[in-house]
């Protein structure tokens, strides 16, 4: 396998499938099947999940909520997704732990870096919830931060599109997909991959990002194996 330890970033929107809201159980099971194949190869996998299928802090803020309050609500939404994902993974036979940046001991472990790494070494999947525990930081930034903390070899951003484009492929039929590009190209071109804080964190810590389509069966395994899918961002 190309990567010994990887961090997978799942958006909340990915979990809702074609629904307008919430969690699609079939999507969760499809992700669990793909993750099971990856774990069986010996790759250590951590997951950061967003909460946009339930609540998005920026939208709450735009609607008049205090931004910090809205972000905390969004963090709680990610915990709901993390626990649901844990259930799906464990039903697929994958030992899984949820760690949250905001303590809620009845449902999850607190985030402790060394404990998370020990879980990974034992072949468990670790799902990180509640973002990084601070408002004003996205779950993409959390993914970059956790990847650096656990010494991940790569960040996988699994989305609804098959890579990074020079403009929105849903709006512009002539959009061009990049097979590979640099962090600096993403930052200077203001390409909508991750927010600039997340990109800068990966750039500074030399952690490549691979962006690919989550809904193509087997893509997580292909990405972990180092097959050329999606778009790769590196230094």
From Swiss-Prot:
The keyword Nucleotide-binding applies. GO terms for biological process: 'de novo' CTP biosynthetic process; UDP biosynthetic process. Pathway: Pyrimidine metabolism; CTP biosynthesis via de novo pathway; UDP from UMP (UMPK route): step 1/1. Its EC number is 2.7.4.22. InterPro entries: AceGlu_kinase-like_sf, Asp/Glu/Uridylate_kinase, Uridylate_kinase, Uridylate_kinase_bac. One of its GO terms (cellular component) is cytoplasm. NCBIfam families: pyrH_bact. Catalyzes the reversible phosphorylation of UMP to UDP. This is Uridylate kinase. The lineage of its organism: Bacteria, Bacillati, Cyanobacteriota, Cyanophyceae, Synechococcales.
């Amino acid at each position: 396998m190309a990567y010994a330890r990887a961090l997978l970033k799942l958006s909340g929107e990915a979990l809702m499938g074609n629904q307008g809201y919430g969690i699609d159980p079939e999507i969760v099971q499809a992700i669990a099947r793909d993750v099971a194949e990856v774990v069986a190869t010996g790759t250590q996998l951590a997951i950061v999940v967003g909460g946009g299928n339930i609540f998005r802090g920026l939208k709450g803020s735009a609607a008049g909520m205090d931004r910090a309050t809205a972000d905390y609500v969004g963090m709680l939404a990610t915990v709901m997704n993390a626990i649901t994902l844990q259930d799906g993974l464990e039903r697929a036979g994958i030992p899984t732990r949820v760690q949250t940046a905001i303590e809620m001991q009845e449902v999850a472990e607190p985030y402790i870096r060394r404990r998370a790494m020990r879980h990974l070494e034992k072949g468990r999947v670790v799902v990180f919830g509640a973002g990084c525990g601070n408002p004003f930081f996205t779950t993409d930034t959390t993914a970059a931060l956790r990847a650096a903390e656990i010494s991940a070899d790569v960040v996988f951003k699994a989305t609804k599109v098959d890579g990074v484009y020079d403009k929105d492929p849903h709006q512009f039929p002539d959009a061009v997909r990049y097979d590979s590009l640099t962090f600096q190209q993403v930052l200077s071109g203001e390409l909508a991959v991750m927010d600039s804080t997340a990109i800068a964190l990966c750039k500074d810590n030399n952690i490549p990002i691979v962006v690919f389509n989550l809904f193509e069966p087997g893509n997580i395994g292909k990405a972990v194996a180092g097959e050329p899918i999606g778009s790769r961002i590196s230094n």
